[in-house]
């Protein structure tokens, strides 16, 4: 299992909820805030394709592709995914353009989960972001297996969202049961 943390804040509510979801599960986790993933100019239609970029994207993507289950964890920033997460996903265009990577083939059939935490009625207002992830996963042939939306804004407020905690625990149980098979 691979976890992509998109928050710019260490030990925030999104991380806390995600950690509850994966407690006791063997995972590889990356924190995008600790890596450099530059935005790029869209060169999908240029004859030469994208220009090489000296950052961590390729290494992070290669690590992601080694796993069958991936969790995308992002705070709800202005009703969308974090900038760190958006840069990472936007760069998939570069991976799709380079046919030698076989990116879409490697993404096909992967099981995807999403964790989103935010304030201002996120159980409703994060739903467009859930739909966005669904469309992204559909495009690359991955299977959207589920999501958890947490309602929290201040430090450690996620502990007050019983519904999100319960759902995270249910996924944790599911992951543990599937590891035993």
What is each of the regions a protein language model found here?
Residues 1-99, 162-181:
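N-terminal beta1-alpha1-beta2 submodule of the flavodoxin-like/Rossmannoid cofactor-binding fold
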Residues 8-11, 76-79, 119-123, 153-156:
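Short histidine/acidic/glycine/proline-rich micro-motifs that form metal-
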Residues 38-41, 152-158:
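A short acidic, helix-capping loop that chelates divalent metal ions and anchors anionic groups
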Residues 101-145:
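Short, glycine-/small-residue-rich phosphate/pyrophosphate-handling segment
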Residues 113, 157-166:
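Juxtamembrane/interfacial segments around transmembrane helices
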Residues 146-151:
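Beta-strand-loop-alpha "switch" segments that mediate conformational coupling across diverse proteins
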